[in-house]
Amino acid sequence: TYMYSGMADVAALTGDTAYIHAIDRIWDNIVSKKLYLTGGIGSRASNEGFGANYELPNATAYCETCASIGNVYVNHRLFLFHGDGKYYDVLERSLYNGVLAGISLKGDAFFYPNPLESAGGYERKPWFGCACCPSNLCRFLPSVPGYVYATRDDSLYVNLFMEGTSDLNIGKNK
């Protein structure tokens, strides 16, 4: 998902239609065939990635917390590029069900993978040998307010429903 975020950035910066069509096809494939109901992505632990189309097991779902963060990034970039709310529909599911599920309410324990089913033996842990998720969550969570609003030309978008205030420039108006 991080590579796809970069690809979306390149598409937006260059206007290269090959990149635009490619990232749109990738997004369509992910959303229609590889996305869990929760917004989690990545069914395989072996490659920390996608499996075949419709390979979405519950008990062995990988749905890494970092992948959910990356899914927020790519959907935000595609929303900014296309201006279509469908990207925020996916972003919101990934944020609330994939990212926030990855950290305990106290902020001291984490899920690396987020399986959808457990026989009771799965719990958040304080640390991992590969501790990308805790540090990634620490970096990502303070950025959430930046996803609430967006402006484009003379339009204001309220993308996430949460308490807050903001001063925004919309067209020539503040």
Q: Model regions: which residues?
A:
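Glycan-recognition and catalytic cores of secretory/periplasmic carbohydrate-active enzymes
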Residues: 1-174
